[in-house]
Amino acid sequence: MLKVIQSPAKYLQGPDASTLFGQYAKNLADSFFVIADDFVMKLAGEKVLNGLHSHDISCHAERFNGECSHIEINRLIAILKQHGCRGVVGIGGGKTLDTAKAIGYYQKLPVVVIPTIASTDAPTSALSVIYTEAGEFEEYLIYPKNPDMVVMDTAIIAKAPVRLLVAGMGDALSTWFEAKACYDARATSMAGGQSTVAALSLARLCYDTLLAEGEKARFAAQAGVVTDALERIVEANTYLSGIGFESSGLAGAHAIHNGFTILEECHHLYHGEKVAFGTLAQLVLQNSPMEEIETVLNFCQKVGLPVTLAEMGVKDDIDGKIMAVAKATCAEGETIHNMPFSVTPESVHAAILTADLLGQQWLAR
């Protein structure tokens, strides 16, 4: 099987990147259709529009109604056609960015995504999650290429709620461990082949960056300021983790995350918070050295990620609920089957309960 790595054509990061990106956007199109919800348009819209206008790029801004659905995508495409725009810019969170990607795909136009948070590694990916108008999952749209440009304005991201940056660290925490599992299993990644050494190296750099810079970056985010540590964590959460997961693969941690989504008491958690606990469970499942498990426990505690079921909200009927989670984790087609050994609901159940006890013991020290 071929080894494959993929990534956005261009990645920009730094304070005021959402204004400075125009000098690169002019190489993609001479007019852009810009979408954002009302809150984000007030927060960052002026910077983005000024960044385009300063390079003689025309644009039309349109309100995103909040759901990445086929109805909303088609509504926005109709408006885009009226204005004849030749590129798409999405500003905001995951659903806005996914909608921008979809519009660009269907209209065969270049896409620029400008996240206002660093809570997941999704912005760099060639993927959108499509929902119904009622907000229920409908399908994944897999694209033939990644966004043409990803723009991370760290001055904006530093002002976002700290918990979102920490959740991004939780998502990124899994990248190295899942990438290594997929590499060892010679699993097929979302890029359509086996992992390259380059993708695996980025995944490892992601983990090393989290350990070195994560706690410092959390303090910077609490102060609402940009520091070198925050810059490095934004890059780890977004670019390093994004290339690492897409071009190396997902395994135990994300499958366990998906299993936890069946529990109503976990619905308040962000994606990365569930993934962080899933990472601990994967480490138990693959019988990682105790030193490695304790390193991850220490990191999670210092930045504020959950390490016990109680912190996840699971406090009663634990055995039965975790067996249900384990069965969902092992469903056909789940990424748990990318682990380099056979996995059963029983082994996942055991790993989750053991991870919980390890977390309890760590917090009680």
From Swiss-Prot:
Cofactor: Mn(2+)
Family membership noted in the UniProt record: Belongs to the iron-containing alcohol dehydrogenase family.
Superkingdom of origin organism: Bacteria
Protein encoded by which gene: dhaD
Entry keywords, A to Z: Glycerol metabolism, Manganese, Metal-binding, NAD, Oxidoreductase
Transmembrane segments: none
Residues binding glycerol: D121, H254
Activity control, per UniProt: Inhibited by zinc.
Pfam families per the UniProt record, alphabetical: Fe-ADH (PF00465)
Species lineage: Bacteria, Pseudomonadati, Pseudomonadota, Gammaproteobacteria, Enterobacterales
Cited NCBIfam families: PRK09423.1
Protein name per its UniProtKB record: Glycerol dehydrogenase
Reaction catalysis annotation: glycerol + NAD(+) = dihydroxyacetone + NADH + H(+); hydroxyacetone + NADH + H(+) = (S)-propane-1,2-diol + NAD(+)
Pathway: Polyol metabolism; glycerol fermentation; glycerone phosphate from glycerol (oxidative route): step 1/2
Subunit details: Homohexamer.
Sequence positions that bind Mn(2+): D171, H254, H271
Class of enzymatic activity (EC top level): oxidoreductase
Enzyme Commission number(s) of this protein: 1.1.1.6
Signal peptide: none
